[in-house]
Amino acid sequence: MKLKASISTGFAALLLASCAGAPLVRAEPPAQVAPTDPAHRAIVQARLVADWQLAHMDGFDYVATFRDHTADPTGWIQSTFFIGLTALADATGDDRYVQAVIAHGERQDWGYGARPRHADDDAIGQAWLWAAARSTPSQREARLAATKVRLDAVLAAPSAAAMDFGDARGEQACQVRWCWSDALFMAPPLWAGLSAATGDSRYLTHMDGEFRATVEALYDPEAHLFYRDSRFIERRGSAGARIFWSRGNGWAYAGLARVLALMPADHPSRPYYLGLYRDMSRALIDAQGENGFWPVSLLEPGGPPETSGTGFFVYGLAWGVNAGLLTPAQARPAIDQGWAALSRSVGPDGRLGWVQQVGYAPDRVSAEDTQLYGAGAFLLAAAEVSQMESKRP
């Protein structure tokens, strides 16, 4: 389903080499940045967003819901921001951002949350691996130790739990595996990254099998999109359309890009992931709204702007152009409109708005809504857009 008639015209490298006042957030006009070249302008905005978020890491009274989850320093919400910060650190070479990630890791002793098999608690490990790639041999061992223990325990006793998500609230029995689309961002890049960092193929083999299980359970081969979890396979939206949540697909698409960035070029499973990535890319380009944002429910146009899903999609598309997997003709119009939409969502102080709050389905969103994972998605997108723009003729 095409929702628009027309659109206007290293994390991986490091690992492989190592084997609040009241803000004003407006949809229009764009946040004010210096009238420089587009590559630099993307980084200027990314710095603004990163600096605002780093200055607001206490209290979280500006977050509408789930403040306790937001305050968890190794939980998925903060993890996504720090993953984005690693991308900005790589793009800028700014030691402030490098040290912010390292200081966060040191405060947490490079450890994890209390759930040893829950993908949400895996996500922070991507920042730990990045920091390990920037360390001395002794530091590296310390920064990888908890990650090895965590993943080795899963290898020693892999789960065969069914992938069905229950209707009850709270954690589900299937969440010892990747039975919801968000998990594809949280966990697979950690497994692929540890394989790259250590040279141990067992981690990548496990990732491959579990990722395929999630695709089998949740991927719609006709729409080339993911259901958030098994509850949504038979559900329909108010207009009768299948429900493909924007951020849920953003998690999956960004995770897929990050896995491809880490997977060896000659790996026998790489063609499988390339096919999945290209099919999703085409579907997502078709689903983009006329305003540059992706709708909160991808097959239902209209609704409010939303920046977390849009950020992940711009990131994944721009990464594909930079990696030579998508042609500029295919993807740049969508990237350009998506990045313009994201830019319009940054307030003068750097606060990112229009971020749907913590949830599991399409929901309402307002200009004042912000969250750390939205900022993380923005930073990931900015780093790739800047690289893409630096190569534009």
Predicted regions located by residue number:
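Extended ligand-binding groove/face enriched in aromatic
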Residues: 98-102, 108-233, 238-240, 349
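Extended ligand-binding clefts on enzyme/binding-domain cores
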Residues: 142, 181-185, 189-296, 303-314, ...
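CBM-like carbohydrate-recognition segments
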Residues: 32-79, 86, 91-98, 107, ...
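Bacterial N-terminal signal peptides that target proteins for export
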Residues: 1-11
